[in-house]
Amino acid sequence: MHCPFCFAVDTKVIDSRLVGEGSSVRRRRQCLVCNERFTTFEVAELVMPRVVKSNDVREPFNEDKLRSGMQKALEKRPVSSDDVEMAINHIKSHLRATGEREVPSKLIGNLVMEQLKKLDKVAYIRFASVYRSFEDIREFGEEIARLQD
């Protein structure tokens, strides 16, 4: 790691500690040239697969878009933001676990529906009605009947 003070290449780690519930490492470093000390933080970079939309357009995975879609479905429902974040993290780890560089948007939609079904049935129906483009009340009824099985 380069020294931020004198830009020397040689630095040494003098202390390391886990921070943020073990998700990152805080390191105290000292420059071997100017002897200045500084702190760095290390976090694992987890690469998400690209999303292939139904029209074959490819775009980077967008966590904000995922969160926004789930929050719309969960609007005014009794679900905590912690539960939503856990669901999002579950979806992201499932996508990473595929080992693929690209995943179809349909897979993401199905994972969202799976998580919403566990969190709140009303939110699940809201999301499903838009995601599956329900045309009439009969389709709502069929989906509700499937939920009750």
UniProtKB/Swiss-Prot annotation:
Where would I find the ATP-cone domain in this sequence? 49-139
UniProt cross-references to InterPro entries, sorted A to Z: ATP-cone_dom, NrdR-like_N, RNR_NrdR-like
This protein's source sits in the domain of life called Bacteria
Zinc fingers (unnamed): give the ranges: 3-34
The record's cofactor note says: Binds 1 zinc ion.
The cofactors named for this UniProt entry are: Zn(2+)
> Which PANTHER family would you find in this protein's record?
TRANSCRIPTIONAL REPRESSOR NRDR
User: Which protein family is it in?
Assistant: Belongs to the NrdR family.
Report the protein's function. Negatively regulates transcription of bacterial ribonucleotide reductase nrd genes and operons by binding to NrdR-boxes.
Protein name per its UniProtKB record: Transcriptional repressor NrdR
Annotated source species: Cronobacter sakazakii (strain ATCC BAA-894) (Enterobacter sakazakii)
Source organism lineage?
A: Bacteria, Pseudomonadati, Pseudomonadota, Gammaproteobacteria, Enterobacterales
Which gene name belongs to this protein? nrdR
